[in-house]
């Protein structure tokens, strides 16, 4: 009888332990703008950022901000996980369409409401969607480099798309800097590589005011360089000069 009671107690403990993540997800969903499925997907990401990558957050995205474009250096496939640490609100992000082509990945990206875009040329449909959603109050993360930086450079050449989107949506740009990500362009590598990552969040930049509402090439380049230098300042770098990407930026990167 005592042995049966012990087994029953163990079974109850195991069931409760198995249900704990579910109860946590339900509780967080009630308090969060994320829906239940998004919470279930983000919970493992939160575990990775807290324990495997021992992440530290310096600054947060203002809770009362009505839409913004987040920009950051881009070192790993896990970068969006760190960006989400900075806000209770769901942060959307853009990824290259080829990385969401598989049926399972495509379904997961739909749940997370990720925006897919082509990397060659201008993806008009994706750009219009980002402008529309940022204008409606959503936080969107865009990486000006447009590809992973696996070089020794602070940042590679950048494009002005994120700044153009922010100006047309009438929202600020929030610069962020990810520090100490020792990862490569192997997508899975971050998930088995311990690290001590820090995310620095800067002050919102009124790019509409800086650009006087204009999106001509010269204005976009000037405002983009200003925003990129703010990322460098978060890294403690004050003498870095950003490089703007040319038309063949992707070809140059892969050659």
Kindly give the residue locations of the regions a language model identified.
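Catalytic core of membrane glycerolipid acyltransferases/transacylases, capturing the structured
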Residues: 63-121
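N-terminal signal-anchor transmembrane helix
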Residues: 28-67, 107
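Short, flexible loop segments at the rims of nucleotide/cofactor-binding pockets, characterized by
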Residues: 46-53, 70-71, 116-120, 151-153
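Hydrophobic core of alpha-helical transmembrane segments in multi-pass integral membrane proteins
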Residues: 13-26
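Non-catalytic C-terminal accessory region of glycerolipid acyltransferases
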Residues: 2-15, 125-255
